[in-house]
């Protein structure tokens, strides 16, 4: 327990906040090149084949990023934009690829939450 005089002289040390997406180095997004595109199985209660990509970022760091949405056009050497955000049931996946930016096309046929999947507004059909 510090004395009052010690607190006046030195103050308390602020706790450092640890980044949840360190590879982005404080940037909101980073550009990268897909090194490998593959599927992984999620943790225990869930079952699926989740689409992920190993991405080498423009700062040289290599990360595993999740590809959201149904279907994608990504392959090796595709250039993508990566943002922070983990996938709870995939251990070690702490980044997501932004759909509709650079080489990652938007999700086809998406009608709701389109902005999150890079989908353009659908054409209005003539209603009878």
From Swiss-Prot:
Annotated region described as Disordered, given as residue ranges: 1-24, 105-128
Q: 3-methylthioaspartic acid: which positions carry it? A: 89
GO terms for cellular component = ribosome; small ribosomal subunit
Can you state the subunit structure given in the record? Answer: Part of the 30S ribosomal subunit. Contacts proteins S8 and S17. May interact with IF1 in the 30S initiation complex.
Annotated InterPro entries: NA-bd_OB-fold (IPR012340), Ribosomal_uS12 (IPR006032), Ribosomal_uS12_bac (IPR005679)
Name the record gives this protein:
Small ribosomal subunit protein uS12
PANTHER family linked to this entry = 30S RIBOSOMAL PROTEIN S12 FAMILY MEMBER (PTHR11652)
The UniProt family comment states: Belongs to the universal ribosomal protein uS12 family.
Quote one Gene Ontology molecular function term: structural constituent of ribosome
What keywords are assigned to this protein? Methylation, Ribonucleoprotein, Ribosomal protein, RNA-binding, rRNA-binding, tRNA-binding
Q: What gene name does this entry carry?
A: rpsL1
Q: Which domain of life is it from?
A: Bacteria
Which is a GO BP term held by this UniProt record?
Answer: translation
Primary role: With S4 and S5 plays an important role in translational accuracy.
